[in-house]
Amino acid sequence: MKKSIIAAAFALLFGAQGASAIGIFDNLCYQARLGYNIGGTMPMGMPASIRGLNSYTPKPSFTIALDAYKPLTEKWGMMAGFHFQTKAMETDARVKSYSMEMRQGSESLSGLFTGNVVTNAKQLVVTLPLQATFSVSDAVRLKFGPYFSYALNNEFTGYAYDGYLREGDPTGTRIELGNTPDSWGTYDFSDQMRHLQLGVNLGADWQFHHRWGVYADLAWGVTGVHRSSFHTIEQTLYPIFGTVGVIYRLK
């Protein structure tokens, strides 16, 4: 193990020296970012089993980031960074014949639920974006590219209430769920969420001062938040979040 770590350290060292020799680290501009995220995990299109949204509540979600920008030509460049992010939301939806697994008291239930479902989703992720940039002017820069995220912590919990569950299939035993905590059907699918996530990011930076600027980004996941082997929720849910925040130029 120790030999592997030493070998990796030497590889990084010589790799960095080689990159420096060809000028990759020349003329770099470093930026710190603080942003607020708003969005959620959602399907592409509204499935027939989801009849409407009673409420959507964004939860406090933030980005703390360090980016490095490298100009390649007068207009074009590239940007990479290290982003530490929280992404959270709560929804309350009306559903009909919605595939679910839940617990009511000590009993495990599965089948098709008609009623209301509350979902709380939260992730703590480290994101590595790699973007091409285009400078519209000295102050405004557009950017687009892929990102890679690793979830340090996943939460996907909630409860079904004020409805009924048909066990197994649409003709199964009908089980009533009320609107008080002891009559809800609760669920926790946190252990079925992916750790590695991929997506695309686009946005714009406006540097209105030598040091200070503002930015807006949109991150769209192309992998679902749950593992491919998870089929309790019929539709694939994707993380889609927008971010607005401030930039401070370090160099």
Role assignments for model-derived ranges:
Residues 1-27, 251:
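Cleavable N-terminal export/targeting peptides
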Residues 21-71, 140, 149, 193, ...:
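Short glycine/proline- and aromatic-enriched beta-strand/turn motifs that initiate or cap beta-hairpins
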Residues 32-38, 80-86, 144-150, 216-220, ...:
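Transmembrane beta-barrel strands of outer-membrane/channel proteins
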Residues 40-59, 87-123, 151-197, 201, ...:
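Extracellular/periplasm-exposed beta-strand and loop segments of Gram-negative cell-envelope proteins
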Residues 206-210, 238-251:
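Outer-membrane beta-barrel "beta-signal"
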Residues 75-78, 139-142, 210-216:
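Repeated loop/turn-to-beta-strand initiation elements of outer-membrane beta-barrel proteins
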Residues 65-69, 131-133, 205-207, 215, ...:
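Transmembrane beta-barrel domains of outer membrane proteins
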Residues 31, 61-65, 125-129, 201, ...:
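Membrane-embedded beta-strand positions in outer-membrane beta-barrel channels/transporters
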